[in-house]
Each structure stands twice: as structure tokens, then as C-alpha cells.
A protein has these predicted regions:
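Helix-loop-beta substructure at the N-terminus of cytosolic sensory domains
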Residues: 22-70, 260
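Regulatory sensory and allosteric helical modules in signal-transduction proteins
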Residues: 69-131
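Regulatory loop-to-helix N-cap segments in sensory/regulatory domains
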Residues: 136-170
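Regulatory cytosolic signal-relay segments
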Residues: 163-217
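Catalytic NTP-binding/metal-coordinating core of nucleotidyl cyclase/transferase enzymes
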Residues: 209-297
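Alpha-helical scaffold within the catalytic cores of cyclic-nucleotide enzymes
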Residues: 247-261, 282-324, 349-359
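Catalytic/regulatory signature loops of cyclic-dinucleotide turnover enzymes
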Residues: 327-328, 336, 349-376
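Cytosolic regulatory/linker segments at or just downstream of nucleotide-handling modules
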Residues: 361-410
Length: 410
């Protein structure tokens, strides 16, 4: 007996497209589409869609809808294409044989024994299974490709899916895949921008601030750090080992910056330029205390993290030493470059001053050196962690500057 009498699924398809145009969260889009199918009579109890994403931490993402629990989103750190979980899945079979649709009666067919995931569904009371693959761009989808997605549709109904049920799911698949493709492309774009430029710059680029010279003046606590003896380490270590060492350093330093709400603007070789935007008046005013305190906490965390790794016997960490300079001042946050190649960053005298402050960390044999512009903005309790280094000439800076060191890093 047919379970759904859907003469026309245009309304469902239209609703899916409308959700995509309205930029609804992907969870709402999937939830709405599945609920409409169920309301139309399709005995759907579970739908899952999976696809690869471009992200430094995750290989893939899946969205699972069930009648009982609604929508759940999962991320996969690593998709092992040689592992048994993937190789014994219906999608491996489909991609290997260039099959775009696979239907199996879970409650009847012995074939399901080759697919552990279907045996699991059978134990949970499912009776029918339909898998469909959509390729983007015309070429067949591959396991490594971002150009497509896989879907599976399951029911617990004793009679399984009827012909009109399957027709309904097929008809809904194209608009659903199109809407999800927009979401996937948007997420890949955001992930790439956030990874290579940081969320603040990435957000500004997506908002349209891409013209040369576009920018804003703001006050910020500035951070500049660099790895000591980087040339010697690069010469002494194989390339792969040196890259591993750099990543340990970046995890300690840049990781601490981001945890405190700072923005890593640039990684230049082994140097890190970051800033903590201040709310309120410019550097000439009394504000910026919170930004300065965040920068100091990040510096303390970075050095403490490195010390902890050394105590644990981390061989890469044992070779690492880095100095940090922290300053506060006005900068122009915007982009500059050629007409065809622009770069977002911070520009101004304060950027030079924080770099010169970081230079003094090496000269004075300190881990963290802080300018008086920072110290004047923090609380008296926060100043207790600092020791006065007196006034020093900074290369290229007209007048001597009073500098301080984090006492805990001496």
C-alpha cells in the first residue's frame, strides 16, 4: 500500500528554496523540509546528509534529522577513507561504483549484512533505506571532493517506503541540495577567511569593505612577538621539524591571544602581530584598560603554556624561546596594497612602537616587555605583576620610553 499520495511537491520545494534565500540556519532549513514531507504523508523517521567542508580542524559535517529528536549537527575531525567505518558504508559502495541511488529493504534483504550501519538501523526498528548522492558541477562525486553531498532516508513503517514516497523524496532532493550547497559554499568561504585572516577581518571582507584605502581609526592594545634564534633553528632542523616547532610556538602565543579575545592580524615568518580593540575613546583618552588587561593575560598565558610544555618534556618546546612586546595606541584598521592585491591590517606609528618594544624584550633579556601606555591604563592590582625597567631608547622612535616587564616571566 502506498503511504503518501503526493501529486505535487512543488510547495515543499518552494518552501525549501525560500528558506535558502532567507539565509535561515541550516538546521531550520532541514527541520522544515523534513516536517513538511512527514505532514504530506511520507513515513520518514530519519534523514541524514553529509558533506566535506574546508576547515583546519574538521574534514566533514553531517546533519541528522529524526522524527523523535529533530536536527543534530556533527563535525568529523578526520575522515579515514581507508578505515572500515567508511569502506563498509553504503556511500563507499556507491562512490566506488558510481551509483547515485541505492535502495535497500532493511527488514528483508540479506545484502544489508555487508553494511554495519544498516544492521544498526535494523536493530533500532528501521525497515527501509534510500541513499541518494548529488554531485555539484557535473562530474561524479569522489570521496575527497567538496563538490557534492550524500543523503540517506530511512523509515520504521512496516511497509517501508512506497513508490510515491520515493518520488516525493527524489523531488525534494534537488531543491534541498541546492539550498544546502549555498550554505556549504558560504560556510567554506567564511571558514577560509577566518582561518587565513581572522574572524574580524573575514567579517569585514564579507561585509564589503574591500576597496583600497577603506578603513577606520581605533585604539587598541597591540601585541608583537617573535621566535628567538629562528634562523639558527631553521638551519639546524629539517623543514618538517622546524614547521612542527613553529606550530608549537604559534599554539602557545597566537592561541593565547585568541582565547583572550584578541585578533591575530598577521603571521610574518615567526613573528605574530595581533591587537585587542578597545571600546570607548581613542588612545589619547583614559579608556582601553580592559584591552590592555586582556593582552597582559594572554602574554602570561603564552609563556606559562610554553613552560608547562617544557616541564612535560616536549622536545619541540624545549628549543623555543620567544619575546613579546605590548603597547597601546591608535591605529588605522583597513586595507592597502595594489588595485588587484589588497591586505587588511593595522597601520600607524603605534605598530612600529610595539615592534620596537618587542625588540627590547631580547635586549633586556625579558620574556614580556610592556610600554607605559599600557601600564597607565590598568588597575593598581594588575600593575603588581609588573616591574619597572626605566626609560629606554627604542630604535627609530624619537624619545625614550618607559618600559615594564611581567614579573612572573623574569
Amino acid at each position: 500500500m502506498e503511504q503518501a499520495a503526493l501529486a505535487d511537491n512543488t510547495d515543499i520545494a518552494t518552501a525549501i528554496i525560500a528558506s535558502g534565500i532567507a539565509d535561515e540556519p541550516v538546521t531550520h532549513l532541514v527541520e522544515g523540509a523534513m516536517r513538511r514531507l512527514v505532514s504530506a504523508g511520507v513515513p520518514l523517521d530519519r534523514m541524514q546528509v553529509g558533506f566535506r567542508i574546508l576547515h583546519p580542524l574538521f574534514d566533514g559535517m553531517s546533519i541528522t534529522w529524526t522524527e523523535a529528536a529533530g536536527v543534530e549537527v556533527s563535525y568529523y575531525e578526520h575522515i579515514d577513507l581507508d578505515g572500515s567505518t567508511y569502506r563498509l558504508s553504503p556511500f563507499h559502495y556507491m562512490l566506488a561504483n558510481e551509483v547515485t541511488e541505492l535502495r535497500l529493504r532493511i527488514d528483508r534483504e540479506a545484502t544489508i549484512e555487508r553494511f554495519p550501519v544498516l544492521m544498526e538501523l535494523k536493530e533500532r526498528g528501521f525497515t527501509d533505506y534510500l541513499a541518494m548522492i548529488v554531485s555539484f558541477g557535473g562530474a561524479p562525486m569522489t570521496p575527497e571532493s567538496h563538490q557534492g553531498l550524500g543523503t540517506s532516508w530511512s523509515t520504521k513503517h512496516p511497509a517501508g517506503f512506497g513508490a510515491t514516497d520515493i518520488a516525493a523524496m527524489r523531488q525534494v532532493l534537488a531543491p534541498l541540495a541546492l539550498a544546502l550547497r549555498v550554505v556549504i559554499k558560504d560556510q567554506i568561504t567564511r571558514n577560509a577567511l577566518n582561518t587565513f585572516h581572522g574572524p574580524l577581518v573575514g567579517g569585514r571582507i564579507l561585509s564589503g569593505l574591500i576597496k583600497r584605502g577603506a578603513g577606520e581609526r581605533l585604539a587598541a592594545a597591540l601585541w608583537y612577538s617573535d621566535l628567538r634564534n629562528s634562523t639558527g633553528l631553521a638551519d639546524a632542523l629539517p623543514v618538517e621539524a622546524f614547521l612542527d616547532l613553529l606550530n608549537v610556538y604559534f599554539d602557545c602565543a597566537a592561541g593565547a591571544v585568541m582565547e583572550e579575545g584578541g585578533q591575530v592580524l598577521d603571521i610574518i615568518g615567526d613573528a605574530i602581530l595581533a591587537f585587542f580593540p578597545a571600546s570607548g575613546p581613542p588612545a589619547s583618552g583614559p579608556g582601553g584598560g580592559q584591552a590592555c588587561a586582556s593582552a597582559l593575560r594572554a602574554a602570561s598565558t603564552a609563556q606559562s603554556r610554553l613552560a608547562a610544555l617544557k616541564a612535560q618534556g616536549n622536545t619541540r618546546a624545549e628549543a623555543i624561546s620567544f619575546g613579546i612586546g605590548i603597547h597601546f595606541g591608535d591605529v588605522v584598521f583597513g586595507n592597502a596594497g595594489t588595485a588587484e592585491r589588497l591586505k587588511f591590517g593595522i597601520i600607524g606609528r603605534s605598530v612600529n612602537e610595539v615592534a620596537r618594544t618587542a625588540d627590547m624584550a631580547k635586549v633586556l633579556k625579558r620574556d614580556v616587555v610592556v610600554s607605559d601606555a599600557v601600564v597607565s591604563r590598568i588597575t593598581s592590582a594588575e600593575r603588581l605583576a609588573l616591574s619597572d625597567l626605566g626609560e629606554h631608547e627604542l630604535r627609530g622612535i624619537p624619545s625614550a620610553r618607559r618600559l615594564w616587564a611581567l614579573a612572573s616571566t623574569e
